[in-house]
A protein has these predicted regions:
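Bacterial Sec-exported substrate-binding components of ABC uptake systems
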Residues: 2-79, 188-224, 268, 276, ...
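Extracytoplasmic ligand-binding site segments that recognize negatively charged/polar headgroups
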Residues: 98-100, 140-151, 159-185, 218-240
Length: 335
């Protein structure tokens, strides 16, 4: 029986691959979309600016809301859950052993339960083809040959793709406004702008108030890092969190992607934010900065090493406001 099920699965996979790879595959996908989107909202069509898998700008059009979504990473998935799209997600790839995964299940139990397939870490192209998506939302790195393949391959088959611009340095200098564009794009794609506009208003109002309150303060040197036993990953001012730091009156002095322990000590910033992916990462980071080799650092001596979830600082999406507040608390603990 088990062998028969396996054989049927591979036959189904082969049939779906043939659909996608055949010359008429695109038309069949369009037929599928039309069949499932009768009575589309007058909100559509929607035009969106995004990027292709090489990082070049591209323009996509949605004739209707996506019906079969494949999505990568926690914050992108959370965005779709908040916007009530759980029943449209046919595949979600993320770290299922992290604290963020457990948090999503706990925070959005009903919406999360609607997600058809949750897959550990990555989805290959053959697996994605079998899911029959009409929209793929992912980082640029996910559109590599060993995973989804190029965005053009999917576009040629009638599948819209959206590359999250604040990941993988698609933008050389990403800002909070770039993250706001992602949130706005999702609101427009799924016709949920009432929700996204409310968040965007909160983000912009919070930053305006913070910038006014911190005006005239002495600038602080800040490092935002990840430690995992090897080199130390440095989030420089080219990332969204770098823009958060800058707008809150700080600066990140180091520009290298990776730094060593000696460089960390010699930099001696006023405050350090150590980002972590899971509980193990948090405990590892805490133990790392307890090392005697860091005792001379001001941030260590003054209790200004703060541990924050990586989802607050990297492609934060709906966590952008949480990230801003966490950075502000760490930089201005008495405010």
């Amino acid at each position: 029986m088990k062998n028969m099920k396996k054989a049927l699965f591979f036959l189904l996979m082969a049939a779906i691959l043939a659909l996608f790879l055949s010359p008429g595959g695109e038309e069949k996908i369009y037929e599928y979309a039309e069949k499932h989107t009768a009575g589309a909202s007058s909100h559509y069509p929607v035009e969106i600016d995004t990027y292709d898998s090489s990082g070049a700008p591209m323009h996509i059009t949605f004739a209707h809301a996506p019906m079969r979504i494949v999505v990568d990473e926690v914050n992108a998935l959370e965005t779709l859950l908040i916007l009530g799209q759980g029943d449209k997600i046919v595949g979600a790839a993320l770290n299922t052993s992290g604290v963020s995964y457990a948090r999503l299940k706990q925070t959005y139990p009903q919406e999360f339960a609607k997600v058809e397939h949750v897959i550990q870490n990555t989805i290959g192209r053959e697996q994605a083809v079998a899911l029959q998506p009409d929209f793929i939302l992912a980082w640029k790195a996910s559109f590599a040959p060993r995973w989804y393949g190029s965005t053009s391959w999917w576009q040629e088959r009638g599948v819209n793709t959206y590359v999250i611009a604040t990941a993988n340095h698609v933008l050389q200098r990403a800002t909070v406004e770039d993250e706001c564009k992602f949130i706005d794009d999702m609101g427009r794609i799924f016709d949920r702008q009432e929700q996204t506009n409310a968040l965007l208003d909160d983000i912009r109002a919070s930053l305006r108030m913070d910038e006014e309150a911190m005006g005239g303060r002495a600038p602080q040197s800040v490092l935002v890092v990840e430690v995992d036993g090897g080199d130390i990953l440095n989030y420089d001012e080219g990332w969204v969190v770098g823009d958060m730091v800058r707008r809150l009156g700080g600066h990140i002095p180091l520009t290298g992607k990776y730094i060593g322990e000696e460089e960390l000590v010699s930099c001696d910033p006023d405050v350090i934010f150590a980002a972590y992916n899971d509980e193990y990462g948090k405990h590892f980071s805490e133990h790392f900065f307890e090392g005697v080799r860091f005792n001379s650092m001001r941030a260590v001596q003054n209790g200004r090493v703060h541990f924050i979830p990586v989802e607050y600082v990297y492609t934060p999406a709906f966590k952008t406001l949480d990230g801003i507040r966490a950075i502000r608390r760490g930089m201005y603990p008495d405010e």
